[in-house]
């Protein structure tokens, strides 16, 4: 809100948070939500939401000459670094999460040829059908809002079948607490 009060021309790539009431309030304060960098006018101020954006989108925003306020969650930024490094090393990035989630789409945009699996069953199926080749080096990350249970189920499969896999626990503890508290209510 402070930024909206100080800036005239403020945009966000996608909704900042998953809360329609808050998004509507921010829009009433002057925030314009856009779907892509091509909708950002030169000289605007742009907020990158906590889910992050792909490398291509980030660079496209920078090319507009916009002032960029990067609110990407530090945990998500770390995943971007992990998968980018994996690609640079020739490792196959595997992302455990919801393929259509903005965070996962953004992660995919920081690496080459990522494979996204939703859960242990899909992971096992992708290994069985050869989409994931366990003989090759893999780097496995998980969407920050996923559960430890899902990670452990996938970890069992990976440890049993893949000999050269680096598995990163990239789940956000704060998200787990929030999810747990919401489930308790």
Which ranges hold each PLM region?
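Short acidic low-complexity segments
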Residues: 32-41
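Internal gly/pro-rich beta-alpha loop/helix module
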Residues: 68-69, 82-88, 93-130
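N-terminal beta-loop-helix "entrance" segment that forms/cooperates
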Residues: 14-30
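Short internal beta-strands
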Residues: 10-16, 95-97
